[in-house]
A protein has these predicted regions:
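N-terminal intrinsically disordered, cationic/polar leader segments
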Residues: 1-32, 38-41, 45-104
Length: 104
């Protein structure tokens, strides 16, 4: 199962952490993992194309995206990513788990 942890502060995304494997199919054939990876990579690349200092990310066994600048464009792209993850989870709820923390 892919596990996603989203941290917000006053509605702004501070970080997104992801780990695990969807387990929908064998490695290399898993459409859930392929979709999830595509969404993550596309979002990271779009943000870095606009401003290479807007986020930091690590991609080992656990992916973590940290929103450094928290500007409108970066936050909009990260919110779009979260919305896409929820949409994917709605179709594959046995393969994706999402937790959100919001600090005011």
């Amino acid at each position: 199962m892919i596990k996603v942890n989203i941290k917000r502060n006053n509605g702004l995304i501070e970080s997104i952490k992801c780990h695990g494997h969807a387990g929908y199919d064998d490695y290399g054939k898993d459409i859930v993992c392929a979709s999830f990876s595509t969404m993550i990579i596309t979002t990271i690349n779009a943000i870095l194309e606009i401003d290479k200092d807007a986020i930091s990310y690590t991609d080992t066994n656990n992916l973590e995206i940290i929103n450094i600048k928290k500007d409108n464009i970066t936050n909009s792209l990260l919110n779009n990513l979260v919305n896409m993850i929820y949409e994917l989870r709605n179709n594959y709820d046995k393969n994706i788990n999402i937790k959100e923390e919001n600090h005011e």
